[in-house]
Amino acid sequence: MAPIKRGDRFPTTDDVYYIPPEGGEPGAFELSKFVKTKKFVVVSVPGAFTPPCTEQHLPGYIKNLPRILSKGVDFVLVITQNDPFVLKGWKKELGAADAKKLIFVSDPNLKLTKKLGSTIDLSSIGLGTRSGRLALIVNRSGIVEYAAIENGGEVDVSTAQKIIAKL
């Protein structure tokens, strides 16, 4: 599938999972209901605890979350295929456990990732097929206003600073 681009409707699937902020067991994240009439930023990453994601990509979004939200964004959605328990631990490790507007969702079967046209094959280093790195701005009508899709493992066009400049 071709990568998502400006003007495309943001695809939804309810086959993504999370652990609610109040805790408990993992459950389905009703993406189709949650995103309705909201403006949001999507950040897709290859994997929790991987050096580029943990040291370069996500820290910018965490540090700049108040600034992003001040631009009329309702929340930032982080997507990767790791399970919800790993994502909860990663969010805590990143110092963002209490950031309710930063939502980490698991796409274990890559259904959403495939709809975004953003998979990356990391089999050569033992990681299999993963979510590719990208960032999107989605408006309240569910249309992608801006799409930044990285080549391979780069961390450049999808950084928080570049997304803020487009908000």
Curated annotation (Swiss-Prot):
Keywords on record: Allergen, Antioxidant, Membrane, Methanol utilization, Oxidoreductase, Peroxidase, Peroxisome, Redox-active center
SUPFAM superfamilies, per the entry: Thioredoxin-like (SSF52833)
Reaction catalysis annotation: a hydroperoxide + [thioredoxin]-dithiol = an alcohol + [thioredoxin]-disulfide + H2O
Chief place where the protein resides: membrane
Catalytic residues as annotated in Swiss-Prot or TrEMBL: C53 (cysteine sulfenic acid (-soh) intermediate)
Start and end residues of each Thioredoxin domain: 4-167
Record PROSITE patterns: THIOREDOXIN_2
InterPro entries referenced in this protein's UniProt entry, alphabetically: PRX5-like, Redoxin, Thioredoxin-like_sf, Thioredoxin_domain
Localisation: Peroxisome membrane
Pfam families cross-referenced by the UniProt entry: Redoxin (PF08534)
Gene Ontology cellular component list: mitochondrion; peroxisomal membrane
Stated role: Thiol-specific peroxidase that catalyzes the reduction of hydrogen peroxide and organic hydroperoxides to water and alcohols, respectively. Plays a role in cell protection against oxidative stress by detoxifying peroxides and as sensor of hydrogen peroxide-mediated signaling events.
Family: Belongs to the peroxiredoxin family. Prx5 subfamily.
Name of the protein described by the UniProt record: Putative peroxiredoxin-B
